[in-house]
């Protein structure tokens, strides 16, 4: 994958964290890797669980633009294989005391990541450091996303120019889609009052899409609470597209 560290260095970092007194730490682990089988994916996940992290981010590889894999796509597992890996991995994590609270986030009891929960609930956050991203909501209803300069050397050498590389103010008609892109990843979904408070929009505008998606059994609604069904979680991209303008 082109990572700059080895597995031995990863294990060493875990030991250093424990020796430093941290009783809570997270491990990131990808699946759906080139030529990966169900057995090798389970082996990787077993190895991560054996390290006893309090939180585990287990997510599928995605091919991003401007990467080596995007220029030269590798042979990846097919959809059925990915589904088997996902199902088996979720069961393995549950059997070892890890509860899923977001599409790719699992934790032991009491160790949900507060930053993750805020982020996926469409909360605001500050991006600090090279390449960091942030989101700020303003009293007048504007919502801005920004990112800092990506390269550490460039970031640290900036004197007369701002550290922020770019900012973007969300258009009003895309805010609902942006909210859904985050909140529907959470197992518990969101409440309609939460949608209103985080976006500044009237949740009544969601009614046509919510009714349609509930009829298709992709979403489930319990009074003011909305979340994706098991099937819906497999088709989040299609669900989210319903809330963006054509």
Where are these regions (language model features)?
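A short, conserved structural fragment
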Residues: 214-224
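Alpha-helix boundary/capping detector
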Residues: 74, 118-119, 206-210, 221-222
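Minor-groove-contacting beta-hairpin "wing" of winged helix-turn-helix DNA-binding domains
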Residues: 225-230
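Short, amphipathic alpha-helical interaction segments positioned at domain boundaries
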Residues: 231-246
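Short amphipathic alpha-helical interaction segments
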Residues: 200-214
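C-terminal scaffold of the Radical SAM
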Residues: 1-201
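Short, charged low-complexity intrinsically disordered segments located at boundaries
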Residues: 119-122, 212-213, 241-243
């Amino acid at each position: 994958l082109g990572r700059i560290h080895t597995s031995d260095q990863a294990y060493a970092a875990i030991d250093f964290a424990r020796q430093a007194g941290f009783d809570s730490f997270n491990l990131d682990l990808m699946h759906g890797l080139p030529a990966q089988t169900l057995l090798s994916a389970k082996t990787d996940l077993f190895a991560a669980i054996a390290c006893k992290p309090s939180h585990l981010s287990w997510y599928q590889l995605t091919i991003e633009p401007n990467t080596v894999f995007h220029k030269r796509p590798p042979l990846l597992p097919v959809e059925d294989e990915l589904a088997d890996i996902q199902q088996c991995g979720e069961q393995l994590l549950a059997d070892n005391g890890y509860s899923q609270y977001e599409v790719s986030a699992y934790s032991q009891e009491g160790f949900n990541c507060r930053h993750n929960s805020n982020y996926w609930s469409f909360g605001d956050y500050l991006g600090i450091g090279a390449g960091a991203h942030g989101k700020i909501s303003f009293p007048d209803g504007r919502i801005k996303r920004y990112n800092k300069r990506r390269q550490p050397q460039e970031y640290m050498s900036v004197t007369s120019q701002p550290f922020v590389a770019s900012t973007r103010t969300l258009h009003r008609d895309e805010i609902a889609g942006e909210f859904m892109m985050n909140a529907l990843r959470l197992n518990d979904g969101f409440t309609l009052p939460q949608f209103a408070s985080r976006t500044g929009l009237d949740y009544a505008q969601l009614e046509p899409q919510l009714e349609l998606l509930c009829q298709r059994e992709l979403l489930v609604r319990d009074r003011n609470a909305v979340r994706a069904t098991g099937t819906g979680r497999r088709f989040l991209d299609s669900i989210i597209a319903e809330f963006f303008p054509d």
